[in-house]
């Protein structure tokens, strides 16, 4: 674990300290995991700087793009989103925002030969003629159902214009909510994506934990699904604006209940 800065991103100074400490203690680090869209606020780590550090130390760079990775396939102007090509591997979950039926999760690697050398054992019942390679040996699972078909169909249905519309509108909904939530009443924690968390000002831990619990219950009764993540030993309320069908009037109704 690495300490994060005030914007919720990985702190490079703390990262270097942590890696150096592990080296002194004889602990071997085989990978550093950067996050493209943190769970609580949708923050994006400084992937380019982390990549340079990983190259210097010969450490594998993996990006957890479960939340924000899908944004990287678009031309949307989002800071740090276009640095995914620096990674050795990345996970992307199209099910989280594009509406692809579960489960739809991808592991993309820059060099598939590494997966082949790691997992392939050779199968006596599969022919090796004509340099044929069984792609089922690229992971721990020997076989998978045709889950890729629903992703392919979903992407074909949306097209690049549709994908960008879905993703861009999610950011606009978060911005609208953030701009209209009472900042005199709440502390806000967000990033460049579609996620925002908030907490009332001036409350101690017990007070805010009780408030978030009761407020979430009351909002659920009004058909608003707001999550309550634990972050830095306190509970927050978190709004995720990935649903394409969420209208401005829906958000205004939520704001009335909060403001």
Task: Pin down the residues of each PLM region.
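Short amphipathic alpha-helices in soluble, non-transmembrane regions
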Residues: 210-220, 252-259
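Conserved PLP cofactor-binding pocket of PLP-dependent enzymes
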Residues: 191, 195, 221-238
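Conserved PLP-binding catalytic core of the aspartate aminotransferase-like
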Residues: 187-218
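Active-site C-terminal subdomain of aminotransferase-like
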Residues: 82-181, 192
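PLP-dependent enzyme catalytic core of the Aspartate aminotransferase-like
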Residues: 231-259
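Conserved PLP-enzyme active-site core in the AAT-like
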Residues: 4-114
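Anion (oxyanion) recognition and catalysis
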Residues: 51, 55, 182, 218-220
């Amino acid at each position: 674990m690495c300490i994060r800065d005030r914007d919720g991103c990985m702190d490079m100074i703390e990262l270097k300290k942590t890696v150096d400490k592990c080296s002194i203690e004889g602990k071997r680090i085989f990978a550093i995991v950067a996050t493209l869209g943190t769970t609580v606020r949708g923050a994006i780590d400084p992937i380019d700087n982390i990549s340079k550090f990983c190259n210097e130390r010969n450490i594998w760079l993996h990006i957890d793009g479960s939340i924000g990775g899908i944004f990287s396939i678009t031309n949307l102007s989002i800071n740090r989103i276009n640095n995914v090509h620096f990674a050795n591997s990345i996970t992307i979950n199209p099910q989280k925002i594009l509406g692809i039926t579960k489960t739809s999760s991808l592991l993309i690697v820059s060099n598939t030969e590494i997966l082949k050398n790691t997992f392939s054992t050779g199968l006596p019942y599969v022919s090796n003629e004509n340099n044929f390679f069984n792609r089922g040996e690229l992971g721990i699972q020997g076989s998978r159902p045709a889950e890729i078909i629903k992703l392919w169909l979903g992407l074909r249905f949306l097209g690049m214009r549709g994908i960008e519309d879905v993703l861009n509108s999610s950011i606009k909904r978060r911005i609208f909510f953030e701009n209209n939530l009472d900042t005199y009443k709440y502390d806000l924690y967000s990033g460049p994506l579609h996620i925002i968390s908030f907490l009332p000002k001036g409350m101690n831990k017990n007070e805010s934990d009780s408030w978030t619990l009761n407020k979430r219950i009351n909002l659920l009764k009004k058909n608003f699904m707001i999550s309550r993540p634990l972050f830095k030993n306190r509970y927050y309320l978190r709004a995720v604006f990935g649903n394409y069908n969420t209208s401005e009037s829906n958000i205004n109704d939520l704001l009335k209940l909060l403001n």
